[in-house]
From Swiss-Prot:
This is Large ribosomal subunit protein uL1. It comes from Lactobacillus helveticus (strain DPC 4571). Part of the 50S ribosomal subunit. InterPro entries: Ribosom_uL1_bac-type, Ribosomal_uL1, Ribosomal_uL1-like, Ribosomal_uL1/biogenesis, Ribosomal_uL1_3-a/b-sand, Ribosomal_uL1_CS. One of its GO terms (molecular function) is structural constituent of ribosome. The gene is rplA. GO terms for cellular component: large ribosomal subunit.
Amino acid sequence: MPKHGKKYLDAAKKVDSNKLYSVAEAMKLVKETSYANFDATVDVAYNLSVDPKQADQQIRGSLVLPNGTGKTQTVVVFAEGPQADQAKAAGADFVGSDDLVQKIQDGWLDFDVVVATPMMMAKVGRLGRILGPKGLMPNPKTGTVTMDIEKAVKNVKAGQVEYRVDRQAAIHTPIGKVSFTEDQLVENFDALRDVILRARPASAKGQYIKSVAVSATFGPGIKLDPLNLD
């Protein structure tokens, strides 16, 4: 068992580990149990009854949270010509081609999201070993490989988050900050819940959502009722 500090233990006392909370109760509690000395991120963890090894059960996508993420995302765009102009106009922080490839190969990673046109993916592919392990590789399923660069950049800046089932059949996604109101957190939670429900593979068996928990950075987990997420 990992040892926790006094602040964590004090926060954990507010959570009944045997209770399954409603969404509204959980969002109230996640704010109350945050003890970080910064505006902590609120994360949701879903455990699903899917087999990620099966190609048709690999759940992945993105959505724009109605109230954003509370974080300013630094966006890199690989594009040329009109698409590069679109990216700059839409507010991309860095736009380029071979110059950006070289910069990243030299160790620069001061960004949060990478967007690329399909034509640029051959060049971006050379960065697979660098971007892949950090979850930064552009992908059509998350809307980050596209010809509509303007839309992609604006979505990221508006609060787009990605969701992806991992090897343990879990999805971990941020839904905001503890400074958000309870209603804002509930609305963001609902938006993520809806896309995860819609993404249920036809071949998935049994109870699709096995468990759900929310937590603030460093804070204790708060379990929700997976059968009552309204």
